[in-house]
């Protein structure tokens, strides 16, 4: 078996391939670090008034929380 006259991967081609394969990974890692730094540097508000979760209606039955009306087609309960 004869070897090709021009090698498929020469020294220049290898460094070129390594550069173009490592560049997207390095760029993605850099952007992820910058994004995480941005998220962690934001001050969290102690009183988030726009986030208000009222869990009491979930622990009560519908008759206790005043949600007694039924929707059309829901007279007997859930039908799967």
Swiss-Prot record:
Q: Where is the protein localized?
A: Membrane; Nucleus
What's any one GO cellular component for it? nucleus
Q: Which residues cross the membrane?
A: 16-36
Any one GO biological process: brown fat cell differentiation
Q: Is Translocase tagged as a keyword?
A: no
What is the annotated tissue distribution of the protein whose record heads this document? Selectively expressed in adipose tissue where it is particularly enriched in brown adipose tissue. In adipose tissue, expressed exclusively in adipocytes and not in the stromal-vascular cell population. Expressed at much lower levels in heart, stomach and muscle and barely detected in kidney and lung.
Q: Which residues get modified to Phosphoserine?
A: 63
Membrane-protein topology: Single-pass membrane protein
Q: Which InterPro entries match?
A: Adipogenin (IPR027938)
What is this protein's expression induced by?
Induced during adipose conversion of 3T3-L1 cells. Up-regulated in 3T3-L1 adipocytes by troglitazone which stimulates PPARG expression during differentiation. Down-regulated in 3T3-L1 adipocytes exposed to TNF-alpha and to retinoic acid.
**Record's keyword terms, sorted:** Membrane, Nucleus, Phosphoprotein, Transmembrane, Transmembrane helix
Q: Which family does it belong to?
A: Belongs to the adipogenin family.
Protein purpose: Plays a role in stimulating adipocyte differentiation and development.
Q: What's the protein here called?
A: Adipogenin
**What is the gene name?**
Adig
């Amino acid at each position: 078996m004869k070897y090709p006259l021009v090698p498929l991967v020469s020294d220049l081609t290898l460094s070129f391939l390594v550069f173009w394969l490592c560049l997207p990974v390095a760029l993605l890692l850099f952007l992820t670090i910058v994004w995480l730094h941005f998220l962690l540097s934001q001050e969290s508000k102690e009183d988030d008034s726009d986030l208000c979760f009222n869990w009491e209606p979930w622990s009560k039955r519908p008759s206790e929380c005043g949600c007694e009306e039924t929707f059309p087609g829901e007279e007997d309960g859930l039908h799967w």
